[in-house]
A protein has these predicted regions:
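Short secondary-structure boundary/capping elements
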Residues: 17, 63-67, 363
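Generic structural signal for well-ordered secondary structure
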Residues: 28, 45-51, 65-68, 74, ...
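Generic N-terminal leader/targeting and pre-domain segments
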Residues: 1-28
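Short His/Asp/Glu-rich catalytic/ion-coordination signatures at enzyme active sites or charged loops
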Residues: 60, 84, 215
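Cysteine-centered iron-sulfur cluster-binding motifs in ferredoxin-type domains/subunits
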Residues: 19-38, 68-89, 313, 343
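Non-heme iron-sulfur electron-transfer modules
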Residues: 1-11, 37-70, 88-116, 399-404
């Protein structure tokens, strides 16, 4: 796609990056077939090709409007279109640029500004955990719209204390410790059972995704630099990997190298951090032999059958498909994915469920319909946002897959102890 950049964008990093991405687009429209919002709304401007045209017009000097902003806001940034595109259009990076340019020219109403500010400042804040705890205390009194965002409190269980020669770093995340603390401790226990010690850099915080995708890119980059500083001593001490058990964080940290590529102080470190980053499921191939010796077949068989929802940030953002299901099956678990639309977004998409609740809940209900869990099944996923969003629409338990593996290991140990 040929683009004639307006003079104001010709010599800018954003303009040049966007032009290079647009050059790959051949208008084929394959992306519309796998775009969740196009499937719901049937509007060309609510699909990737239409949004690309809107961004192209802005880059060529056309003044954007609130309608332009709305169509870009409706994008989930699920990146399903990237998996479908035969030309390799880097849509995710393009829409980040497009939103930044449009927001610079289209003021948002004060109400929208307030909500977006509260999200980008509140979710990564140390005050989020006590606020969530308070919400959980009064959860029965909350209206359904708020109750959907406040999960039932859970016990995290004990953190392992054994020392191992093999060590990995893990990002705890900003919302996960407050909303689902068992995910991090279950990760530590499972890796401990496989002979791997989990280390946590206490000064590391939000991965930067919330601010970056809410168009506070400078704020997001500041959080990324702070994380690199927190992790670097562990990297120098030889940490094997930087493990992510939330695929939304993982896809962001894997892009630190790209996002900070022009930062003379952090570019090399950011690239190294990205290369070191692994989704938790990427460790499983090496750990399967040890885990098989730690698991009792009866303990695994006593676990419920599993229905796996692969997050978009895992299957499209990180291009990791099929691994979770295959590895769990190799350990003896009964696991399946939805027969239809397993590739489509559940509607969570970070802060999307707050900013676009109507579309988000339509996608959630559609996803739950295709997952169709039976009475004896549990839904599993690999991202805190997907887990809490899906749980808000079903009585079927929704868990992280590592929690199920941890439960089977615990049952095995209890059986041996008995």
């Amino acid at each position: 796609m040929q683009t004639q950049l307006a003079p104001e964008y010709q010599n800018t990093a954003d303009g040049q990056a966007a032009e290079a991405i647009l050059r790959k687009c051949v208008h084929c429209g394959f992306c519309t077939a796998t775009c969740p919002t196009y499937q719901l709304l049937g509007d060309e401007l609510d699909g990737p090709r239409g949004r690309i045209y809107l961004m192209k017009q802005v880059l060529e000097g056309q003044t954007p409007t609130r309608a332009t902003q709305m169509h870009l806001d409706r994008c989930l940034t699920c990146r399903n279109c990237e998996s479908t595109c035969p030309s390799g259009v880097d849509y995710g990076h393009l829409v980040d640029i497009g939103r930044k340019l449009v927001d610079a020219k289209v003021p948002r109403p004060l109400g929208e500004q307030a909500v977006r500010w509260a999200l980008k400042e509140g979710l990564p804040s140390p005050l989020f955990a006590p606020a969530m705890k308070l919400g959980q205390m009064v959860r029965p009194l909350l209206p359904q719209s708020l109750k959907n965002k406040v999960p039932v409190p859970q016990d995290a269980g004990a953190w392992p204390t054994r020392q191992h020669a093999r060590k990995v770093l893990m990002l705890e995340g900003c919302v996960q410790p407050a909303m689902a603390p068992n995910i991090n401790s279950a990760t530590a226990r499972v890796l401990d059972a496989a002979g791997v010690q989990v280390q946590v850099a206490r000064k590391a915080g939000c991965c930067g995704a919330v601010k970056f995708h809410l168009n506070d890119q400078d704020g997001g980059k500041a959080e990324m630099r702070a994380n690199i500083d927190a992790w670097w001593p562990y990297v120098e001490q030889g940490a094997d990997a930087l493990v992510m058990n939330a695929s939304g964080c993982g896809v962001t940290v894997k892009e630190y190298g790209h996002i900070l590529r022009d930062d003379p102080q952090y570019a090399a470190k950011a690239a190294h951090i990205s290369a070191l980053t692994r989704d938790l499921s990427e460790l499983l191939p090496d750990l399967l032999p040890v885990l098989k010796t730690r698991l009792d077949g009866q303990a695994v068989g006593a676990q419920p059958a599993l229905v796996f929802h692969p997050p978009c940030t895992l299957q499209h953002g990180q291009k990791l498909k099929g691994g979770v299901e295959a590895h769990l099956a190799a350990l003896g678990f009964v696991v399946r994915i939805a027969a239809n639309e397993a590739h489509l977004c559940c509607g969570s998409a970070g802060t999307y469920s707050v900013l676009n609740p109507a579309l988000s809940y339509q996608l959630r209900d559609r996803k739950l319909g295709y997952l169709a869990p039976a009475a004896n099944e549990v839904i599993i996923s690999a991202n805190i946002g997907c887990i809490t969003h899906l749980q808000s629409g079903t009585a079927t338990p929704v868990r992280h897959w590592v929690e199920v593996l941890d439960a089977a290991l615990s049952a095995t140990q209890s059986g041996f102890a008995a």
